[in-house]
Design a protein with these regions (language model features):
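Helix-to-beta-strand junctions that scaffold the AdoMet/dcAdoMet cofactor pocket
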Residues: 1
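Rossmann-like dinucleotide-binding domain for NAD(H)/NADP(H)
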Residues: 5, 9-96
Length: 96
């Protein structure tokens, strides 16, 4: 059995959910943990629903951000961004 664990807490649409369901059924990967789905709330026709009794699939309701550490970091970054804004400084600049 393959023991790789697939985890997605970023964006739902980047995962081929049909392919993931197939890989889990055929034991091509050991397990999967998802905090995001392509369609939320989860569509009853989603192929992952058929694996709901699997002990190799964990789906959480888009709450990865809710960990104390994540919220603490969020507040720290907001504070730093506000301070930088007051000083006319730029932070977290993304250019394409």
């Amino acid at each position: 059995m393959i023991t790789a664990i697939f985890i997605n807490v970023g964006r739902g649409p980047i995962v081929d959910e049909k392919g993931l369901a197939k890989a889990l059924k055929k034991e091509k990967i050991g397990a999967a943990g998802l905090d995001v789905l392509e369609v939320e709330p989860m569509d009853p026709e989603n192929p992952l629903c058929k694996l709901s009794e699997s002990d190799r699939l964990l789906i959480t309701p888009h709450i990865a951000w809710a960990a104390v550490e994540a919220r603490t970091r969020l507040l720290q970054e907001v504070y730093k961004n506000l301070k930088a804004f007051q000083k006319g400084e730029k932070r977290n600049v993304c250019t394409g």
